[in-house]
Amino acid sequence: AQQVDNELSGIALELVGKGKDLAKDLGTEVTAVLVGSGIKGLADELAEYGADKVIVVDDPELKEYRTEPYAHALASVINEFKPEIFLVGATAIGRDLGPRVSARIHTGLTADCTQLDIGDFPINPIPGKEQLHNQLLMTRPAFGGNTIATIACPNFRPQMATVRPGVMQKAERVPGAKAEVIEFNPGFTPDNKYVEILKIVKSVSDVADIMDAKILVSGGRGVGSAENFKLLDDLAEVLGGTVSCSRAVVDAGWKPKD
């Protein structure tokens, strides 16, 4: 469950919601993993969004995100608790962390998933080949988005995936819900924390994050020109939405990358 500055990211709650759906299909429970410093209080929020258990790895060495100690912490949790499925948000942190963790625990990782289901693999029976049940079927765009691939990891556990923010739904919040909290200490050695953070400089963007927008007014190359985007700006203002655009528009210089 990704947190930044002791606040849960939206993707963390989305993954708890999807994890709850998958756990229901498998007849098991959903467990969230909290990694950081001074973050135990966030367990209650995860419980209210559907987590049955919360594993808390709380250590001063985890106050700021650093690849090595975070990868060590998650790999240790997986080796200790042996989950069937492990989901990570496809954020900047998740894309750095997920592949390193999967390599350490010797399992596969399907990146940037847009859909997760429990089903059979192979999906269509093949004569002479065993069809495995209750597999995680991970769907993601491939070849630049020109096709959709469904991938399974039948031979290794856990089945790991990074999931794009904004594509899964949060579960309905249940105020006052509680989860079993398990405190876990993976043990840190100098090899796990050899990078020292000397200074953190944060820049605050004045551009709205489209992931937080309820209404998007989006345009592509067909809008025709930078001047024509003023129509979309006006429409977004009327609707209370945010303007977004395609990569082609950015490449043409009609809209900034941000």
PLM region spans:
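N-terminal glycine-rich FAD/FM-binding segment characteristic of electron-transfer flavoproteins
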Residues: A1-D258
